[in-house]
Amino acid sequence: MSLTLGVIGIDHRHIYGQLGQMLARGCSCKGWYTQGDPQPLAGFLQRFPDIPRASDPGTLLDDPEIDLILIADIPSRRADLAIKSMRAGKDVMTDKPGCTTLDQLAALRTCVAEMGRIWSVDFSERFEVPAVTRAAELIAEGAIGTVVQTVGLGPHRLNLPTRPDWFFDDAAYGGILTDIGSHQIDQFLYLTESDNADVVASAVGNFANPDHPGLQDFGEILLRSDKGSGYIRVDWYTPDALPTWGDGRLTILGTEGYIELRKYVDVTGREGTDHVILVNGDRCEHIDASGATLPYFDRLIQDVQNRTQTAMPQDHCFTVMELALRAQASATRLRGLANA
């Protein structure tokens, strides 16, 4: 038996992956609702033409057949929608960031505790990237010894003409560290097997978009836990010649070797995605990881059915967002920002 889904909020293209991955695993979708006519809606209708539009979100929340609500609304509205969904008896898979303030996070924690529902953030740079699955397998096999550091680089293409007004309002998107930085925090905690971490330093800035002072186009974080250290850099500087939206990379340093992931492109010329480079005492090789599985979605289906936490522990999800929010709040504000 699979799940019945509802979609609320189509303000980010990530909903394509959220819904598409679940439908590919046999789930069905009863309907969707979004405010207005956001830019990603046209692509959503092309991909999912047979799913009906609901007249209001309450229609989906009141439907007893719906098990799981998928959310990709404007980031600042996601927490409230998730809480309404959980109080209506639904589990939730939301796009990142799952919330934009510490007060929202506290309210989400309270709701999960009271309702016993699942609040899961689809950190797509792990959950939708086969290379990360393969890297985790290699680590589990002992290929690089004990992980002691990660360096996560998350460049993104700005695509300025396509961006809505909320994209330039840091109160709406939460800031660059809350938003795209949360991906990298998730991977650091996961790969180092850290339950928590300290934000040693963080910074945000606007170096290339003076006409949009609400946009943070650069951010960095230094994390440290009892298991290791992590450096994170995120930006909106992907140049036009790159054939994809970002040259996302992750280097995982172990005591007996290292792994480098070139997730979406290999600029040295290898075709395709999901390039894993492994170097240890016996091997120095490139691995095509494009055929690795994406277990998050299958496990989330099982978690909804069995009330388990195999896709992602709930505490991990909360901790990722808390660290992202704390890094954002304490970040040194570099040049070019409103109220810098």
Which role fits each region the language model picked out?
Residues 1-48:
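N-terminal Rossmann-like dinucleotide-binding module
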Residues 122-130, 161-197, 214-217, 316-317:
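Mid-domain beta-loop-alpha active-site segment that forms a flexible
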Residues 123-126, 141-162, 176, 180-184, ...:
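NAD(P)-dependent dehydrogenases' Rossmann-like dinucleotide-binding region
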Residues 186-266, 297-303:
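Contiguous beta-strand/loop segments that form the cofactor/metal-binding neighborhood of enzyme cores
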Residues 47-111:
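Beta-loop-alpha module in the N-terminal Rossmann-like domain of NAD(P)-dependent dehydrogenases
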Residues 6, 51, 241-242, 247-315, ...:
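C-terminal glycine/acidic-rich active-site capping loop/insertion
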Residues 76, 99-160:
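A contiguous active-site-proximal alpha/beta segment in oxidoreductase catalytic domains
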Residues 1, 7, 33, 68-70, ...:
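C-terminal helix-rich "cap/oligomerization" subdomain common to oxidoreductases
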